[in-house]
Amino acid sequence: MDVLSCSINTLKGLYDISGVEVGQHFYWQIGDFLVHGQVLITSWVVIAILLGSATVAVRNPQTIPTGGQNFFEYVLEFIRDVSKTQIGEEYGPWVPFIGTMFLFIFVSNWSGALLPWKILQLPHGELAAPTNDINTTVALALLTSAAYFYAGILKKGLGYFEKYIKPTPILLPINILEDFTKPLSLSFRLFGNILADELVVVVLVSLVPSVVPIPVMLLGLFTSGIQALIFATLAAAYIGESMEGHL
């Protein structure tokens, strides 16, 4: 009987874990289109956090920065260093783009662990980090693709497209595909890491006391920051390569 009872309890625990759903969405009907409502909601929250923090930090700028102003100046200097290292001396115009990518991804990733999204109940699905949705990460990848196409064309004009037929026109399809697969690989890596991190925490919380998953959550925060840095760094590297023609 003890063995049977243990087996039943084990199966019940597995059944509870199987209730964790992935891919459930809350849709908004806009004309003939279905829009993922929860992604827009969480993205707006992240944008509001970034804009609100920046506004509060620099509303009274000081010659000798302190507090929030000092923190944001440090972040800006860090983003400038990353951009200059990857793009080169012409990095200046691209600092806002790289900085936006880094900060949006960083805050989005951390929001999945630190913000109590589940307090807000939706008719379908649930709120989670924006980067927990493949649509967000693919959109970021497409923005990166558009950025380095723009950078290359701005630098070289229509001569930028000559690289697609070098060293031989036979490689044209492969060269075109390569330009799109590189940023898309970034999007899948980012999506997979954030989704896996949140699923691991959910499963551990359902199996063990709430204290045990804390180390996993801390590790998740660390890896989330690293993922934001990797995405921003490689985006800057692709832009730099597009301008230099060393793809």
Swiss-Prot record:
SUPFAM superfamilies: F1F0 ATP synthase subunit A
Sorted UniProt keywords: ATP synthesis, CF(0), Hydrogen ion transport, Ion transport, Membrane, Plastid, Transmembrane, Transmembrane helix, Transport
Record bears the keyword Plastid: yes
Location relative to the cell: Plastid membrane
GO annotation, biological process: proton motive force-driven ATP synthesis
Membrane topology category: Multi-pass membrane protein
GO molecular function terms noted in the UniProt entry: proton transmembrane transporter activity
Domain of life: Eukaryota
Main location: plastid
PROSITE patterns associated with the record: ATPASE_A (PS00449)
Function: Key component of the proton channel; it plays a direct role in the translocation of protons across the membrane.
Subunit structure: F-type ATPases have 2 components, CF(1) - the catalytic core - and CF(0) - the membrane proton channel. CF(1) has five subunits: alpha(3), beta(3), gamma(1), delta(1), epsilon(1). CF(0) has four main subunits: a, b, b' and c.
Record family assignment: Belongs to the ATPase A chain family.
Protein name, per record: ATP synthase subunit a, plastid
